[in-house]
Amino acid sequence: MIVLKTLQFTKLTATALIITLALAMSFLVVEPILSLAIEDQFTITQSVTAEISFLTAATDITMSPTIAGLTGGTSNGQTQVIVNTNNAAGYTMTIVASSSPAMQGNTGGGSIPNYTPASASIPDYTFAVGANTGEFGYSVSASTTSDLAQKFLDNTTTCNTGSADTGTLTSCWYALSTTATSTINRTTATAASGATTTIFFRVQITANPAPAIPQATYTATTTLTATAT
């Protein structure tokens, strides 16, 4: 009887072991399927628009010194703007006068004639006014020379050619117009500190202008427009 019970116990033990092993094998087969990772990939999109602003806007200018109406003289002034844009294609800037001639007398109806370059569409490298007259003109300089519109670039002797900005205050003089004139053509975004443009103005009256330029205070109202391209 002892031997029989031992055999029965052994069979039971073996059966239990087989069942346990079977369950373990089932777990090994099923569990990897249950524990595999799955992925769900997606994107988040945010659009950022281009903007442009004046970090520093142009200020009003008082030309200096005053000019004697008969003996004549030369007067200068300047203003500066700083433009900031994140537009990858950069920006353009134009200048336009509100009247023609641009420099109008505040009283009496007089005016100072616009500058007359030797070629109607090309600035003069030097500011030159003929005898017995007076004229008002402007020039443009940029902190990044390549930003300048081509007509304000020079080859050290002639404007609208070359890639230099020679002499700044002494080069590439042009006449204000009631038609917008391109001054800046930048092709990249600016740094956070912006891009600087300086505009110089000059009035020169030669001796005994004819017709006479009446005694008055003269004002030219101009507008700069910067546009993201």
Where are these regions (language model features)?
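Signature of Gram-negative chaperone-usher
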Residues: 31-229
